[in-house]
Amino acid sequence: VRDQADVLIVAGDLTNFGKPEEMEPLINILVRLRIPIISVLGNHDYESGRESDLIQMMSSVGIKVLDGTGYERDGVGFAGTKGFIGGFGRGMLTAFGEPEVKAFVKASIDEALKLERAMAQLRAPKRVVVLHYSPIAATVVGEAPEIHAYLGSSRLGEVIDRNGADLVVHGHAHHGSLNGTTTGGIRVHNVAITLLQSQEPSVAYRIF
């Protein structure tokens, strides 16, 4: 990888069940790549409630974990957060009715606000957004339509269009589509490894 790219981006789900003992062997592999690494966490990484421990483990070996934060390197700004579910376009859930629904929507809005803050930190001429959940519907096409609302949220795409970016990458939609654009025409790429390997079994990453 280091001969082909300047930085490696990991779009979440570094573990299956969010356990530090799962993270340790992955870190041992990543540090041997000898390339700068930028990551966000995915929903799997939250399963055991040990996400803070996972972030600490990654940070201790120099992996930059973005959680509503921005990072600049060699003239490129990276803004990232996990994102959240909530649906797309007219199918996006709104904060109406039961407290449980309002709490659900608040979590989605909070992640969009985290992305807004992260993007506001960037001053570099080139801007890359790193997410786990999708900001657009196009890159979840291929998944069962019944679960599209659980794969991302248009709220993230609205933030991206409002602030501007050159490239967006996300994971999570294992059987979605590789490429799409936001309403404003910004490129979005699904880099979920299951999807990549369904196209080419030997592929573990994409080059941009």
Model-derived features with residue positions:
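Core catalytic region of metal-dependent phosphoesterases/phosphodiesterases
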Residues: 1-74, 143-145, 150-163, 192-193
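Structural motif
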Residues: 6-7, 76-77, 126-128, 167, ...
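Active-site environment of divalent metal-dependent phosphoester hydrolases
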Residues: 15-20, 43-51, 72, 85-91, ...
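A structural motif corresponding to the C-terminal end of an alpha-helix
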Residues: 33, 117-126, 159-166
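Conserved catalytic scaffold of divalent metal-dependent phosphoesterases
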Residues: 52-151, 192-194
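Divalent metal-coordination and catalytic microenvironments
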Residues: 8, 13, 37, 42, ...
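Short, well-ordered coil/turn segments that N-cap beta-strands
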Residues: 6, 35, 124-125, 186
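Binuclear metal-dependent phosphoesterase catalytic core
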Residues: 141, 154-166, 174-208
